[in-house]
Design a protein with these regions (language model features):
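Sec-dependent signal peptide recognition
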Residues: 1-8
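A structural signal for short loop-to-beta-strand junctions that line the ligand-binding cleft
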Residues: 80-81, 92, 132-136
Length: 182
């Protein structure tokens, strides 16, 4: 899958848990943006291959995870948030701003499925698949995401000083070493 962008970065491995176990967020109807994030994530879970013996539960929106993601995105520092608690995290960056939307970000993460071998629980040599496995991790039930337009700390260097930072935090986390996602 080619992304219609000048440049994109996806961190090589979607990180698993940090510290502090987040409690589930209260059930509230998601905003239209939150719903768009869910609408981008849940088809990936429904389409996981090989098909899980029982369907993966649909993700719901976590306002707590979204708040953590938003606070981290506001830093405009392209790295994982060490203070995210026990949340998994996917991050992405693109430039120039507007060259990618939230569905494109999730689709980029999901496209890593082509490099994941479920039978051996490995990624193809030289490829990454941790973003995909976090999305389809069976025990992950909630997600909260954020996006920030940034004008400093560009991971693309001086050629693209303006960039976008995308962060999704997952509750409970996935990507435990040695475990399959489902």
């Amino acid at each position: 899958m080619r992304l219609p962008i000048v440049a994109a970065l996806l961190l090589a491995v979607a990180c698993g848990p940090g510290e502090d176990d987040p409690s589930p967020s209260p059930e509230t109807p998601p905003s239209s943006e939150a719903q768009a994030w869910l609408d981008a994530h849940n088809p990936v879970r429904r389409g996981a291959q090989p098909a899980p013996s029982t369907p993966l539960p649909a993700l719901t929106w976590s306002t707590a995870a979204a708040a953590v993601a938003q606070a981290w995105a506001a830093n405009c520092t392209y790295q994982h948030n060490a203070g995210r608690g026990t949340r998994g995290e996917n991050i992405a960056a693109n430039a120039p701003p507007g060259s990618l939307d939230l569905a494109g970000v999730v689709n980029a993460w999901a496209s890593e499925a082509q490099y994941y071998d479920y039978s051996t629980n490995t990624c193809a040599a030289g490829q990454q698949c941790g973003h995909y496995t976090q999305i389809v991790w069976r025990d992950t039930l909630r997600v909260g995401c954020a996006q920030r337009a940034c004008t400093s700390n560009s991971p693309f260097g001086s050629q693209f000083p303006n960039w976008e930072f995308w962060v999704c935090d997952y509750e409970p986390p996935g990507n435990y070493v040695g475990q399959k996602p489902y």
